[in-house]
Amino acid sequence: MHRSRVMSMDPVLKQKIRRKLIQIAAFGFTNCHAGNFITGKLYNGKFKEFCTPGLNCYSCPAATVSCPIGSLLAVTGKADLKVSFYVWGFLLAIGAVLGRAVCGFLCPFGLIQDLLGAIPVRKFRLPKILTYVKYVVLGVFVVVVPTVLVIATGHAAPLYCKYICPAGMLEGAVPLLLTHEQLRDSAGTLFWVKLGILILVIAGCLFVRRLFCKVLCPLGAIYGLLNKVSLYHLTVDKSKCINCGKCSGCCPMDVDPVKHPRSAECIRCGACKAVCPKGAITIGFGDGKKKAS
């Protein structure tokens, strides 16, 4: 009886439940030490030597593994080429296999944005040109400026983490300040500036679905560049498509999968597949390259 109910479940609801369960599991695996939110301690065990595929602050009290962007900036700032190659290799390998499916299923900050986006207020679409800002952020704050500073001075601060990252504020700085009086007393101008950025991002995510993913995330920029070649991809069978527009209408990233099945913005969430009345959309590791254009 239970199995028959699951099989007959509305495909849109089924997709939402399945995806949310995966997101929650990924969030839980990445943040196993929830008790540290009370004590204010950080986990510093062996698992912190490894990166999570998604964006999750190293300084989050619950974090079990490291943030790939934070790790990349940390080793770049010390000119540690061996470890830097490891982090880049990890990101490129994950991106080549999954592309931005990481953003859709495995990123803790992505889950937070989805929860904010589920609040029933009017949603708006951003001009497409703003989606290119994240590539500027990646180039300037993660790659070019840190590299130039290391070459010139032998050291570089983790610029993106220090000056922009709202995930670091929400998951790391704010919880730590709540549990450490000394940190609260020493909070300066930079803290309040970053708190302002966090508030703007949170408010923006209420009205623009996945705002941070679209505009500011350097990790999404890296995976997005690999979306066109990733093994896990979206395919549209245009012989079945009736151009009803339901797929583009439900996309949280404002992608038209019929026109751009391998868009750098697509997070492979499966919403378009679930809503398609003709089953024209598939997502997986198949040989769908010939069907997708």
Go through the PLM ranges and name each one.
Residues 1-254, 258, 264-293:
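Non-ligating segments of multi-cofactor redox enzymes
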